[in-house]
Amino acid sequence: MAAAVAVFVFGLCVYGYAIQLPFRIDDFVHFRLLSIHTLANVWLGEAGLAYYRPLPFTIWKVINVLTGGFPPVVIHAINVICHALNGALVLALIYLHQSRTAKGLIVGSVAAVLFLLFPFSYQAVPWAGALTHPLVTLLMLASIVTAVRAQDGASRALRVISLAGTVLAPFAHETGVLVALGLTLFLVTSGRAKNLRELVARTWPYWLISLLAAGSMLAVRLHAGSPVAPAEMESRLQNGVYFVQGLAYPAAPIATRLLGLAPGLNDLGAVLLASVPVLALLAFVCVRLGQGRLVLFGLGWFLFMVTPAWLLLAFSYVVDGPRLMYEASLGAALFWSIPVAILVDRWASLTTVVKRLAAAIPAAVVVIGAVVGSAGFLAERADMYEQTRLASVGMLQAAVQPAEDKRNILSVNFPGWIAPKTATYALGHEGVSFIPEYSSPSDLVWAMTGVDSPMYNAVVTELQSHWRFNYLNYGSRWTAPDLQPQLRIARQVLFTSYRGQNLATYSAGRLEAENMARDDAVAASYDDRLAVRSGDWRIVPEGLLVTLHWQSWLTLTQEVRTFVHMRDAATGEMAAQEDGLPLMGLSNPLWWKPGDQWADTRLLVLPQTVRPGKYALWVGVYPADGSARLPALDAARHRLPGDEVMVGIVTIP
């Protein structure tokens, strides 16, 4: 019991960060549909959903009814809890498989840890919409564990629970029809079924339910007009290699190095070359050392669970769906835990420290290598998921602010997809999808807050920055000059910055007013054409966010750039600066009209050399060709030294 609790807590720790994440990809579509459909629609297949998986949608609909929305923390917590429970059930299953021995406890604990850290589960747990995979796995494992306990003479109530789980599993995901196959594999490889007759007696109710469920699923798909046909042979071959990579996950990264060493080798060949010999060698050694039943259980489970996707899905879908290996990951985790089983069996017969050390090293290398590799891979994905959260914060804050103005928000360079610079595995797309083409950040705002916020999304490539991850932005491609009319009609302009270590979405400013009378009570005017009225600022994790309030007096006759310099208030030494066009590079004063008043926000990234203290903020304007600054006058029409004005003193703590 203590080991199961420890495994459960470990599972919560691995993916606990996910409860803070925003929704993504299909979540927006699913929740929109659920908000207008009833539970009856869901169970009758009339909710417009792509797949008939009513159980997870029922959970979300009940939450929606009870809370009036789709609270992200609650919905993400369900995925995380299911995953952690699955880890505990993996331990229980292997413990029972090994007749409740110390060996079963040790091997089960190791397998549970590897299961919880399986790298290709990075999509299934943090993505709310992938609940189908942790949920069906929970129902399948719970059904098998309770079935075995009931057959061992425990409470008859466990038999009822087991059969109920078997009935419900297919309604979570199509893989749920494999409960009977999983139970049969368990009984055969554990030696609990002595002959075929006993095996049939123990499993026939589960086979009956599974076959009825499979027939029902087929009928529903045919009724809905969904295709039910095997994938093309090429896809099946590619799918097979992709799943081999998943099974061999601790060794499979070698394939990326092989690609660099052998230019004529393609990714499929590299995966096979890196994976198959390792899998064959490990299986051979484990069988020769008396672990044939565990090898059969692990490999058999993995094979059975990936078979539906291998046969039916196109490779283009599979290669984007590492979550498809979630149910099968138990088999991979067990397979790579078998060296520990060998060590446990041989431990008592090893009479010297040297012999025990020699036996422990291979097992430790395999398990620790798998743990370290997986943990590093998952940590990088957690970082990418966190970036989507950070990018969302500013957008959500801006979108939910009460505003009588119903004009669109203009969002520029918001992330739609983030991926590592270097791939770990030769096959697959290892990035984190966020906003798909068929959805929009407006849907994100609605799903997270319940607020419908009209939004226009643009990608301005000349303002994209090199960053530590690869990324794609969501929206239509525009140049900054072409975007000027959109800036004038937006109630707020949001800009996602990639300049720092972390993403941040800021309010870049907006057109505050038009056709305003000339205001001579300004901080400074420049060439009698442009005036800065005031400035304010706030410290943010990425630096100093400065907002300048401008008024256009006359149309400019040349391209200009504006600057904000932060200098030591005592010495005048430059500490940080930001030169460029207003609104984080989006708005060109050349197109401002007389009487326009603009709020212009820009980010000053503070170097690590900036010490705590007081700093003056200076503002000026100069021609884009770099020639002398425009003459700056104060409100009394006196020329300002250096043609710049101090708009305030900021204290850096």
Predicted features along the sequence, with ranges:
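C-terminal luminal/periplasmic domains and tails of membrane-associated envelope-modifying transferases
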Residues: 396-653
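Polytopic membrane enzymes that build or remodel cell-surface glycoconjugates and lipids
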Residues: 1-451, 486, 490, 494, ...
